[in-house]
UniProtKB/Swiss-Prot annotation:
Gene: alr
SUPFAM superfamilies: Alanine racemase C-terminal domain-like (SSF50621), PLP-binding barrel (SSF51419)
Broad enzyme group: isomerase
Entry's Gene Ontology cellular component terms: cytosol
Names of the cofactor(s): pyridoxal 5'-phosphate
InterPro entries, sorted: Ala_racemase, Ala_racemase/Decarboxylase_C, Ala_racemase_C, Ala_racemase_N, Ala_racemase_pyridoxalP-BS, PLP-binding_barrel
Known EC number: 5.1.1.1
Family: Belongs to the alanine racemase family.
Function comment: Catalyzes the interconversion of L-alanine and D-alanine. May also act on other amino acids.
Signal peptide: none
Protein name: Alanine racemase
Pfam name, any one: Ala_racemase_N
CDD domains: PLPDE_III_AR_proteobact (cd06827)
Binding site for substrate: R130, M304
């Protein structure tokens, strides 16, 4: 039989989370962000759950082609724009909208010969200092684009650096409003964190919102708030089984480096999951895990193919017992991916994207 580890994607939960995002901004259209292969879930696996989106936002042409191949005829936005001039031809052929964030991209458009004018989102660097034109240069970039016959419509967008934290977004909203005042076109500034935390503000919702991590059941502001606090459902479950049981005595150690020492008699289960499956190696003793739907903890260091769990809360568990590394157990109990990520010093986004190719994936509602 195959190794018992399995990832399960839940399209119904994806759909629920999309509707949750829409409730946060009922008067705006929603971009479903499916970059990085839908945050590791697989674009094709989540597509049915996202059909109700108003558009799909992603990073590259290959992802755009996959969405079109699924039958989507609505808007698709390239969040980083094109990476070289020849990409513009495929944008025309596929009917893609694309961000413009630098002078070179404007130059490429000016030299592009096309019968199909492009719809673009002009990106502002309102303080994150990643991509986009500074507020001081934004209007001149807009004027250059507006003069091009290759450009049909210009929308305005920016990205928040601190929507999930105490610094907030007011300073960036102000910079964006000042620089775009009186410019025509649609606006898009809210990401998942802004949508959930600041979506009640009409100055944030605007015409479009970008729903990213919120679609995949992770809280953008964990641990301040949990996914359940935002009514988000887990969209990925990583589960395995116990393949070995050991009975420890006081003084026995577990795993590489002997990082855990038993203080007395202790039953542990050995689970078929390790860092080669995408489980974070930095998750030390105490990381939450579910065995037969009962919450317990990991023991010792995570190795390439295995990890150990404390069986004290589930004394009847033995070979073949269900182990939920994150997501929803068979009995309905939920272990948020954010809690596991926090124990490993990272974020839920990274765990989703890091699921290893050797892990089988199924789709199940």
């Amino acid at each position: 039989m195959p190794r018992p580890i399995l990832a399960t994607i839940h399209p119904a939960a994806v759909h629920h989370n999309l509707e949750r995002a829409r409730r946060a901004a009922p008067d705006a259209r929603v971009w479903a962000v499916v970059k990085a292969n839908a945050y590791g879930h697989g674009i094709e696996r989540v597509f049915e759950g996202l059909r109700a989106a108003d558009g799909f936002a992603l990073l590259d042409l290959a992802e755009a082609e996959r969405v079109r191949a699924l039958g989507w005829r609505g808007p698709i936005l390239l969040l980083e724009g094109v990476f070289e001039p020849r990409d513009l031809e495929l944008c025309s052929r596929l009917g893609l909208w694309h961000a413009v964030h630098c002078d070179a991209q404007i130059d490429w458009l000016a030299a592009h010969k096309t019968q199909v004018p492009h719809r673009v989102f002009l990106k502002m660097n309102s303080g994150m200092n990643r991509l986009g034109f500074t507020p001081e240069r934004y209007r001149s970039a807009w004027a250059r684009l507006n003069a091009l016959p290759q450009v049909d419509e210009i929308s305005c967008m920016t990205h928040f650096s601190d929507a999930d934290g105490p610094r907030g977004i007011a300073h960036q909203v102000q910079a964006f409003q000042t620089a775009t005042r009186d410019l025509p076109g649609e606006r898009c500034i809210a990401n998942s964190a802004a949508l959930l935390r600041h979506g009640g503000d009409a100055q944030v919702r605007l015409d479009w919102v970008r729903a990213g991590i919120v679609l995949y059941g992770s809280a953008p502001d964990h641990p301040e708030r949990r996914a359940a606090d935002w009514d988000l459902q887990p969209t990925m479950t990583l589960a395995s089984r116990i393949i070995g049981v050991q009975q420890l005595q006081a003084g026995d150690t577990v795993g590489y480096g002997s990082r855990f020492t038993a203080q007395g008699p202790l039953g542990i289960g050995v689970v078929a999951c390790g860092y080669a499956d995408g489980y974070p190696r930095h998750c030390d003793t105490g990381t939450p895990v579910l065995v037969n739907g009962v919450r317990t903890r990991t023991i010792g260091r995570v190795s390439m193919d295995m990890l150990a769990v404390d069986l004290t809360p589930v004394p009847g568990a033995g070979l073949g017992a269900e182990v939920t590394l994150w997501g929803r157990a068979a009995n309905g109990a939920v272990l948020p991916i954010d809690e596991v990520a926090q124990a490993g010093g990272t974020i839920g986004y990274e765990l989703m994207c890091a699921l290893a190719p050797r892990v089988p994936v199924v789709v199940q509602d």
